[in-house]
Regions:
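Class I SAM-dependent methyltransferase SAM/SAH-binding core
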Residues: 1-23
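A short acidic, Gly/Pro-enriched loop at the edge of an enzyme's catalytic core
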Residues: 21-33
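A conserved beta-strand element that flanks and buttresses the S-adenosyl-L-methionine
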Residues: 34, 63
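Short catalytic micro-motifs in class I SAM-dependent methyltransferases
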Residues: 37-40
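A short glycine-rich, Lys/Arg-flanked "PGG" loop and its adjoining helix->strand segment in the class I
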Residues: 46-61
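C-terminal alpha-helical "lid/dimerization" subdomain adjacent to the S-adenosyl-L-methionine
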Residues: 69-127, 133
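Core SAM-dependent methyltransferase catalytic element
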Residues: 126-150
Length: 150
């Protein structure tokens, strides 16, 4: 993946391979930090959030976007989408996309069964991030969370 990115990007863009739980950057190296669809894919979300806070300067903003399981009225349409429509659409594209379509819904459900929203917000605060807020997007199927590094 990095080789393909290097081929497509300008030379001045520096790509760095690393692990979310142990980033190869100095303390406070970044003024701000964003991530997308990360916490479902790491073994220890708490460790990852502490590491993201470590590499962000004090006062810097940290923000993340994740998929979420909608509440209330939007839950049944979401379930239909991730259980049937997404895998079907994936199958129309390719076998690999069919696998992705079948993986996504269970992955999101299992993550929030292990890490309910309230607990995730606590992890952010425990990592040294203050003024933590979150907002549901896309009829509840997404959630953006942000705060400031203390």
């Amino acid at each position: 993946m990095l080789a393909e990115a290097r081929r497509r990007l300008p030379e001045h863009v520096r790509l760095v391979e690393g692990h979310a739980e142990s980033l190869p950057f100095a303390d406070g190296e970044f003024d701000a930090l964003t991530f997308t669809y990360l916490l479902r894919y790491v073994a220890e979300p708490a460790t990852t959030l502490r590491e993201l806070a470590r590499v962000t300067r004090r006062g810097g903003t940290i923000a993340g976007l994740e998929f979420a399981v909608p509440h209330g009225l939007w839950r049944p349409p979401w379930e239909l989408y991730v259980r049937a429509l997404l895998p079907l659409a994936g199958r129309a594209i390719s076998p690999a996309w069919h696998e992705v379509g079948g993986f996504l819904g269970p992955s999101i459900r299992e993550f929030y069964a292990r890490w309910p929203e309230g607990r995730l917000l606590e992890l952010w605060r425990d990592a040294g991030i203050t003024d933590v807020r979150s907002r549901r997007l896309s009829l509840g199927g997404g959630i953006v969370t942000w705060g400031r590094r203390t």
